[in-house]
Amino acid sequence: MKRISILGVTGSIGTQTLDVLRFHKEDFELVGITANRNIELTMDIIKEFSPKYVAINHEESYKKLVDLVKSQGLKCEVIYGMEGLVKVATLDEIDIVVTSVVGMIGLKPTVEAIRKGKDIALANKETLVVAGELVMREAKENGVKILPVDSEHSAIFQSLQGNAHNKIDKILLTASGGPFRGFTIDDLKSVTPERALKHPKWNMGQKISIDSSTLMNKGLEVIEAHWLFDCPYKDIEVVVHPQSIIHSMVQYTDGAVIAQLGVPDMKLPIQYALNYPNRQGNISEKLDLFKIRELTFEKPDLDTFKCLKLAYEAGEKGKLMPTILNGANEVCVELFLNKKITYLQIPEIIEECMNTFDYNKEVTLHNVINLDKEVRQYIYEKYN
């Protein structure tokens, strides 16, 4: 039996991870969880799974949960803040950590978990975007497996199994194109948060839904793929595939292309990561090839969707430029959702930050966290 912690248990990936645990009740024990504000759902999870440790990152929610746990006689330790996140990620009794928190907050607990020798089921792509060099070095030094949960990176990971890494010609990273595929810049001027949140294929949280609509999500995935698979940026090609059936592909030097196909259901890559190297029973509907009428592929429109282009530029420049890109994007998404900026201002402000801040510094936890704070403060003061 594997013992696990889930960081971000009440979010989209966290709740779907719980679905996997319900399906494999005999295979996993949930030891620790973290959440932010959703105390009602957190209480339901505590009652169902009986985790020993619960970390809450929002102060008022933490106080409320402490009172609820005590009044109902539940046996779990409730911890507050970043200290709590790190504790849940580094518990002696766990084998693997599912990092499904959204954004920069996942970086420190992930790095500390790696240093404690915990395998990582990685759904928090920002961790590799801002500190990929550090994270992969620490993973290698500590003998830790980084198992991708993103459907695209899981597909690449599976397509690499049993093949020589040095025979890769290129990675083909698929994208649905999001809800605004085919739109012009003029079309995007009137985009509202409500429209941007409606993804055509995937059930996701708010932040990743906006990122998918701007193609920034794909840009972050390009940087993530660079670090996960030690692949140069010039050999990572984004392919728009609206049907979301092929989750990504690897082309080898002999011309062969190996792809992973499946229904668009995040429980599949979650299940694969948690059970690796084994494959377990089918948690989702199986792909019926006879129901697929067509599989189509397009090049992304980098002029209209500038975020993807900016992500490639940030990745190529390296050092702390991806930290600037990521921090600026997180704040811009927040401001857009709160209707403080327009949709087209998102790439404009990100590019402004990339041209404003010094990125040519060593990638350390200290430097990443400090620069991230500077970027966020700059945008809040100017645009909020």
State the predicted function of each range.
Residues 1-384:
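Catalytic, metal-anchored helix/loop core of enzyme active sites in primary metabolism
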